[in-house]
């Protein structure tokens, strides 16, 4: 299959929102508020400082997946770490190369921009996603994540 990767725009907000609602339910059993999610997606699409959405499209132009890319500055290493977030590929396109193609495009871009690494976090129970990331050459790192809701 021939894939294409594009940056998301405001015109893609509803598609990305649907992906996020589906991803939260599927991967974590979480039902998100659709109004909150679409506003969050629109905010991300409207403000490049928040990050960049990337879409993977099939040959016919249909959007089959997306991810959100953010950047973290490292004062320790004087470089950027790029974070992949909100990954979703429609079920019927999984294991057909859509994510691999999108990931490789983002990796090429990260290398060309001098990023030190690509990072992401994944739910501990989402073993399928963990295996997918390992197939891309990613390794589990030594950091644990902590959070305090405020």
Predicted segment positions?
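Conserved GNAT acetyl-CoA-binding A-motif
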Residues: 110-121
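Conserved beta-hairpin
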Residues: 53-65
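Conserved GNAT-fold acetyl-CoA-binding loop/helix
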Residues: 21-43
